[in-house]
Swiss-Prot record:
PANTHER family: BETA-KERATIN-RELATED PROTEIN-RELATED (PTHR31203:SF1). One of its GO terms (cellular component) is intermediate filament. Pfam families: Keratin (PF02422). InterPro entries: Keratin. Keywords: Keratin. This is Feather keratin 1. The keyword Nucleus does not apply. The avian keratins (F-ker, S-ker, C-ker and B-ker) are a complex mixture of very similar polypeptides.
Length: 98
């Protein structure tokens, strides 16, 4: 850091070394770099929720699905997916592609 005096001479040098004017010393500006501290930001994660599905097992499921399948509003087979029920219902009729 370099400094220099801004004092002016006090005029003729008196017997006593004194001066009535203020003496100022000015130095160059200093630069300071302040690094910001790291900031931790917590973002909320996704909220995952699950809903239990109603499931049924055994013959009740096959009977329910079997009663949904129908032709002309009449269930194909109310007892499940038996081949005998399909054959008696479609005897003499043309089957449509799936």
């Amino acid at each position: 850091m370099s400094c220099f005096d801004l004092c002016r001479p006090c005029g003729p040098t008196p017997l006593a070394n004194s001066c009535n004017e203020p003496c100022v010393r000015q130095c160059q500006d200093s630069r300071v770099v302040i690094q910001p501290s790291p900031v931790v930001v917590t973002l909320p994660g996704p909220i995952l929720s699950s809903f239990p599905q109603n499931t049924a097992a055994g013959s009740s499921t096959s009977a329910a699905v079997g009663s949904i399948l129908s032709e002309e509003g009449v269930p194909i087979s109310s007892g499940g997916f038996g081949i005998s029920g399909l054959g008696s219902r479609f005897s003499g009729r043309r089957c449509l592609p799936c």
